[in-house]
Each structure stands twice: as structure tokens, then as C-alpha cells.
Amino acid sequence: MATGTTSKAKSSLSDALQEPGIVTPLGTLLRPLNSESGKVLPGWGTTVLMGVFIVLFAVFLLIILEIYNSSLLLDDVTMSWETLAS
């Protein structure tokens, strides 16, 4: 008759609560970053910081494009197949 909990049921419950995988130093180091996941703070938060990084990345891409297009000339930076082959 199944009228009570057995030790196997208790152990399976405790096994389900344990985290799967291996505990690594990197995982332990990154755990505080994941503890805030799912929480939304009121206000703009880090939106301004994200905007600054997007603008800096756009400037970086623009500089790379100008170097490739030879619009921005730098000393010792040439874009020809002959110099790449040697």
C-alpha cells in the first residue's frame, strides 16, 4: 500500500533541487551577475551607457570602413594585393 513517503521520494526531491553540472571557479565568479536576472528596475537604467557604447562602436566601424575605402590615409597602411602577398 502506498500511503506514505519513502526515502526514495525524499532523495529524488532533493536531487531535483540541486543544480546540474559541475561547479567551476568561473561559474562561481559569474553567479552574482545571474542573480539579478529577471528583475526590472524602474527608470532608464543603463540605457544611456548602452547608447554610448553603440555610438563608439559605430565610430569604430566608420573608421574601419574609411581605412578599407582609402578615404582615411594612414602611414604604412596600404590596401593592395601586392603588399598583402609579400
UniProtKB/Swiss-Prot annotation:
UniProt main location, coarse: plastid
Membrane topology: Single-pass membrane protein
Chain positions found as Phosphothreonine: T3
GO BP annotation list: photosynthesis; protein stabilization
PTM statement from Swiss-Prot or TrEMBL: Phosphorylation is a light-dependent reaction catalyzed by a membrane-bound kinase; phosphorylation occurs on Thr residue(s) in the N-terminus of the protein.
Molecular function GO terms recorded: phosphate ion binding
Cited InterPro entries: PSII_PsbH, PSII_PsbH_sf
Keywords tagged on the record: Chloroplast, Membrane, Phosphoprotein, Photosynthesis, Photosystem II, Plastid, Thylakoid, Transmembrane, Transmembrane helix
Family from the record: Belongs to the PsbH family.
Protein name per Swiss-Prot or TrEMBL: Photosystem II reaction center protein H
Organism whose genome encodes this protein: Tetradesmus obliquus
Gene name in the database record: psbH
